[in-house]
């Protein structure tokens, strides 16, 4: 007998009720899941074997150098980066094409000074309006770009709504999703187009930029390698948009995860001084009430920049305690001069902890359980640590593996400035220690910490001491050499307590979370990494954060195998 035609007995009423209840519960669970915000990464992986840099001479190739690894010479994994602003997912700002006003060129204007360190943080984000141009993919001759025209945006507007100020208009062709691959296959991403072996990536023409500029749109994005159509419209398109004060993402990816409207989109990147462009990290927030809240903050220009400007004039990296222990200083590397803009295109050679940066678990933890040949002194510290806090963990979680949602959340600022001046000079070098009692005192007045909150310790140290030479000793050198008190830092007991409270990210407006005592610092980082927590160090402007209603956003550049990560922190309120 064919089993599919067997007559089934009628259902019992209780069975019907049980199935109905189960279906209702399933529907409620699905609705609850839809109400939860979801973070989506839209950034390309930066790694030497990927086509992450512009392939033409003399643009520098990306490089990561593992300067120190955990072992006899170092208790930390320390990386140095050679990176320029045309690397991976990136940001373009007006001076890319707009000349400074004093040059009196045809394209001169005040926006010629709107470098990456001058853009207001509200402009980095907004409501994603995804213009679907997948029908243009590969629809052009070799070496030429299919053109996104005003009618493509008009088509979006007919289907959804008019674009406007506060929107981030994103051109989705799925180009990077299809062609960003390890080399040599990855030559198709840019190099094969320049060599006229393949069609170009879709991009807007100048008329499309004029259309958007007249709509009041100031932020764009594309999942193409550049916003400039090849072979001869790259500069006209750039200037057509940048003259309005636009900024945009180049090299976005994974735009298929976004609805046509309603999601919050943002790109954050290191705050390089005088940068006409910059490497960055793009992400979105989809679902629940959070996207609308963040969109409204950006639209109403309620944003605070928490990252200092990165400049070779400033002491952005640790000079170390002893000779030879300093980190790579932050250097600007010029490689191509533009006579029209009177500007050097440039990259940077820097330690991965320069300025505001991420501390992932792998910074202080070895990758596996193999015995680590620590220096004898450090072995003693490890024994002391494990007696009190349990076995030190291991981790392979480098920067690119840290979910963006780990470094975003409701802001909880704990003011610890009362600790400044609390140590005895005879005990220097020493940092005042933030204790569990300090955190609990905060909770009594401000309410209990909640899962997913971002705790920021306000010390005031970077704001007070970040100065160019010769006034630069107060930030690092004097405290490390015992000539001044160190900055307040959390001890490992606080890390354990915050983990129990559901905290994943701890931030500070001090140079680091470890302080000037190397033993205590290492224990803090061991505790942090062993509990799968992360740090964000070197903030500024924490005093400007409102006491309630502020949302913290930080994202590090998506560099593979990096044991720290430069990035940008902002607050939206």
Please give the residue ranges for each predicted region.
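Bacterial N-terminal signal peptides that target proteins for export
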Residues: 2-18
């Amino acid at each position: 007998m064919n089993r599919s035609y067997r007559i089934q007995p009628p259902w019992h009423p209780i069975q019907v009720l049980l199935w109905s209840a189960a279906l209702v519960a399933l529907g409620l669970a699905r609705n609850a899941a839809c109400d939860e915000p979801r973070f989506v990464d839209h950034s390309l992986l930066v790694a030497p074997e990927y086509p992450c840099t512009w392939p033409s001479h003399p643009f520098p190739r990306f490089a990561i150098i593992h300067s120190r690894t955990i072992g006899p010479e170092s208790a930390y994994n320390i990386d140095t980066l050679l990176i320029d602003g045309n690397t991976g997912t990136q940001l373009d700002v007006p001076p890319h094409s707009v000349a400074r006003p004093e040059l009196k060129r045809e394209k001169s204007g005040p926006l010629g000074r709107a470098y990456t360190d001058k853009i207001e943080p509200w402009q980095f984000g907004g409501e994603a309006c995804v213009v679907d141009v997948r029908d243009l993919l590969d629809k052009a001759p070799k070496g030429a770009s299919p053109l996104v025209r005003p009618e493509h945006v008009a088509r979006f507007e007919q289907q959804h709504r008019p674009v406007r100020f506060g929107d981030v208009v994103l051109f989705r062709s799925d180009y990077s999703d299809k062609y960003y691959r390890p080399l040599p296959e990855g030559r198709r991403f840019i190099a094969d187009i320049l060599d006229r072996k393949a069609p170009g990536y879709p991009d807007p023409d100048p008329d499309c930029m004029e259309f958007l500029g007249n709509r009041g749109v100031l932020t764009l994005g594309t999942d193409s390698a550049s916003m400039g159509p090849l072979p001869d419209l790259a500069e006209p398109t750039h200037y057509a948009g940048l003259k309005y004060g636009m900024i945009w993402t180049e090299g976005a990816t994974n735009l298929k995860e976004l609805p046509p409207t309603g999601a919050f989109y943002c790109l954050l990147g290191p705050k390089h001084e005088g940068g006409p462009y910059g490497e960055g990290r793009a992400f979105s927030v989809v679902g629940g009430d959070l996207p609308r809240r963040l969109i409204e903050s950006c639209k109403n220009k309620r944003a605070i920049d928490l990252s200092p400007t990165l400049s070779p004039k400033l002491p952005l990296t640790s000079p170390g305690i002893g000779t030879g222990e300093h980190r790579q200083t932050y250097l600007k590397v010029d490689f191509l001069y533009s006579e029209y803009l009177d500007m050097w295109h440039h990259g940077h050679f820097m330690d991965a902890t320069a300025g505001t940066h991420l501390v992932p678990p792998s910074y202080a933890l070895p990758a596996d359980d193999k015995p680590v040949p620590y220096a004898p002194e450090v072995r003693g510290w490890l024994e002391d640590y494990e007696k009190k806090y349990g076995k030190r963990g291991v981790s392979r979680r480098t920067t690119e593996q840290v979910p963006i949602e780990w470094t975003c959340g409701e802001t909880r600022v704990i003011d610890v400035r009362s600790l400044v001046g609390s140590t005895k000079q005879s005990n220097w070098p020493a940092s005042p220690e933030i204790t569990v009692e300090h955190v609990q005192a905060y909770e009594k007045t401000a309410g209990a910490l909640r899962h997913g909150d971002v705790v920021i310790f306000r010390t005031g140290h970077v704001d007070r001491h970040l100065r160019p030479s010769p006034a630069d000793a107060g930030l690092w050198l004097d405290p490390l050499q015992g000539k001044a008190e160190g900055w307040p830092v959390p001890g490992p007991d606080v890390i354990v307590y915050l983990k129990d409270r559901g905290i994943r990210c701890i931030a500070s407006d001090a140079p680091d979370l470890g302080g000037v005592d190397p033993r205590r610092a290492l224990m803090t980082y061991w505790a942090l990494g062993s509990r799968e927590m992360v740090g964000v160090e070197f903030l500024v402007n924490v005093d400007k954060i409102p006491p309630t209603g502020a949302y913290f956003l930080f994202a590090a550049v998506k560099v593979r195998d990096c044991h720290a990560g430069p990035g940008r922190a902002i607050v939206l309120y």
